[in-house]
């Protein structure tokens, strides 16, 4: 069996092993190698083929006796293959991956002014692909002539591409630029894939600008890497299949609805059925506050509780592959929407008001439920990706959610 893997200095969690397991039958490991140990690893390491990530995409080039034309032109290698004679051959699959992302997004870059945010390791490849597709590229960096202090020069940009790690997990909720500075912007791409929707993409969505994240690029470059590893041709349909599988695994299932509408019950059943962790924003608030929700209301009122709730959602919403039950009033703060939507599909559980319990729920106890529902229903609708009737059995509700996800 071939010995393949991902080479980098600090890898943390990687989706690459799961992607390559879908592509071919070879072992795929993670190789964290310190810079001082890189020469010995490349010359004597026990591997047949590798993907290469930061900070080694340029550092491996002197150890290659052969380079593909694209790797030579870009001066960047993210695929290494050990030949039969023991020498290393370098290639670049990132270019294929980014071009696939552009085409899949439907964003037309030909003849358009494209701003590339960042001049780090991925930027040169992205610039080359955009230029090849006919875009007029300007690079925005922290210290170059075109920088974040003079973005007003580029208000006519039509396409924005983020190549920086700004907004990447775990530091979500941040964006390198404010898209309102670019009134002619007609497309936004972000090569970050975790979270699925970065703050930049969320703003693009809110402004009605076509946009796409980096997961397509990640899967497409893995497919191209596998072709180089195994000297075979793989149908591009595999990219779509694996992308769909990953999205399903990474996406949170978020439940919203009135207090007592069954969110915690349904979350527990979904988590058991799908073998996912279950998260609860009310439980997170109680844990961090060190007191019950009624006590929080008694001590500081609803505003104090809502502030704690938003902090809890900021922490829980950036996780992935979980089932998240929220408090009934989380929709009262607009800033909670991106926290839930960045990695989640949001389901509004609807239940007849007569069936809703009030015990232990301060807002429900103080308010007329019909009036509370009338106030919140438009907010639930604004947050929700899907509406689920929860007047049947819990098992029936779970099945309805699974059908939507399928």
Residue ranges and their predicted role:
Residues 2-105, 195-197, 201, 207, ...:
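Phosphate/diphosphate ligand-binding glycine-rich loop within oxidoreductases
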Residues 8, 92-95, 102, 107, ...:
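Glycine-rich adenosine-cofactor-binding loop
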Residues 146-212, 330-336:
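Rossmann-like adenosine-cofactor binding region
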Residues 192-251, 390:
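Adenosine-phosphate binding glycine-rich loop
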Residues 240-248, 253, 269, 273, ...:
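NTP-dependent small-molecule kinase module
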Residues 263:
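Conserved lysine of the Walker
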Residues 283-341:
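ATP-dependent small-molecule kinase phosphotransfer cores
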Residues 342-379, 386:
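A glycine- and Lys/Arg-enriched "phosphate-lid" helix/loop adjacent to the NTP-binding pocket
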């Amino acid at each position: 069996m071939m010995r393949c893997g991902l080479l980098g200095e600090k890898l943390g969690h990687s989706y690459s092993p799961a992607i390559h397991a879908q592509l071919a039958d070879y072992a795929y490991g993670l190789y964290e190698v310190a810079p001082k140990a890189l020469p010995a690893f490349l010359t004597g390491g026990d591997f047949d083929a590798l993907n290469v990530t930061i900070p080694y995409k340029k550092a491996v080039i002197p150890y290659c006796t052969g380079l593909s034309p694209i790797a030579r032109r870009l001066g960047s290698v993210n695929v290494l293959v050990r030949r039969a004679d023991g020498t290393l051959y370098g290639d670049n699959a990132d270019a294929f991956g980014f071009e696939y992302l552009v085409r899949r997004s439907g964003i037309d870059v030909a003849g358009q002014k494209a701003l590339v945010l960042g001049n780090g390791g991925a930027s040169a490849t992205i610039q080359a692909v955009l230029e090849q597709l006919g875009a007029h590229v300007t690079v925005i960096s922290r210290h170059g002539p075109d920088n974040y202090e003079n973005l007003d020069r580029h208000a006519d940009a039509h396409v924005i591409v983020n190549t920086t790690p700004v907004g990447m997990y775990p530091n979500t909720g941040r964006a390198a630029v404010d898209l309102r500075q670019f009134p002619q912007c007609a497309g936004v791409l972000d090569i970050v894939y975790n979270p699925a929707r970065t703050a930049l993409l969320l703003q693009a969505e809110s402004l009605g600008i076509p946009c796409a994240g980096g997961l397509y690029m990640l899967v497409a470059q893995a497919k191209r890497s596998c072709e180089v590893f195994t000297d075979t041709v793989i149908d591009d349909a595999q990219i779509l299949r694996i992308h769909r599988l990953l999205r399903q695994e990474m996406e949170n299932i978020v439940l919203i609805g009135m207090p007592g509408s069954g969110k915690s019950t349904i979350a527990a059943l979904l988590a058991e059925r799908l073998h996912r962790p279950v998260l609860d924003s009310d439980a997170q608030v109680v844990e961090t506050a060190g007191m019950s929700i009624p006590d929080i209301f008694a001590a500081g009122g609803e505003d104090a509780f809502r502030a704690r709730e938003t902090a809890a959602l900021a922490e829980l919403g950036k996780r992935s592959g979980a089932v998240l039950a929220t408090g009934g009033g989380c929709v009262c703060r607009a800033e909670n929407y991106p926290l839930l939507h960045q990695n989640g599909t949001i389901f509004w559980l609807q239940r007849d008001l007569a069936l809703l319990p009030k015990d232990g729920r301060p807002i429900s106890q103080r308010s007329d439920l019909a009036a509370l529902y009338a106030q919140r229903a438009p907010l639930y609708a604004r947050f929700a990706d899907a509406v689920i009737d929860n007047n049947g059995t819990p098992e029936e509700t779970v099945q309805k959610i699974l059908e939507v996800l399928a």
